[in-house]
UniProtKB/Swiss-Prot annotation:
One of its GO terms (cellular component) is extracellular region. Residues 1-20 form the signal peptide. Glycans are attached at N39. Belongs to the Dictyostelium gerABC family. It comes from Dictyostelium discoideum. It is found in: Secreted. This is Uncharacterized gerABC family protein DDB_G0291103. The lineage of its organism: Eukaryota, Amoebozoa, Evosea, Eumycetozoa, Dictyostelia. Keywords: Glycoprotein, Secreted, Signal.
């Protein structure tokens, strides 16, 4: 193979790999990742149990469109008081509770 052929094959392989992973949102192990948009789009905020309870940042408050859980957590709404238990491996590309979520904690 000549250099042009090798570069072409590498380009095609990289392009195919990128397309195959478009639906696989990135979120580090030990975190919950929240997106403002559905289908893991828009701005992303990460939470880890080391943070204990946290109110979601203003732009995510009652405005989480999707999430990926790489740890266990409890999503909370304060008025009325509701919780949503989240387990490692859970995810949602269209998160209904995200319309009322106020915060996240390591326990319910």
């Amino acid at each position: 193979m000549n250099l042009k052929s090798i570069i072409f094959v590498l380009f095609i392989a990289f392009f195919a790999f990128s397309l195959a992973n478009d639906d696989d949102p990135t979120c580090p192990n030990g975190f919950i990742c929240f997106w403002v948009g559905q289908n893991y789009t828009g701005d992303q905020w990460k939470w880890t149990p080391r943070m204990n309870y946290r109110d979601l940042p203003r732009q995510y408050h009652n405005n989480v469109g999707s999430y990926v859980a790489k740890t266990n957590a409890c999503f909370k709404n304060w008025i009325p008081y509701l919780t949503f238990e989240c387990n490692e491996g859970d995810s949602s590309h269209s998160f209904t509770f995200g319309k009322i979520i106020d915060g996240v904690s390591h326990e319910c």
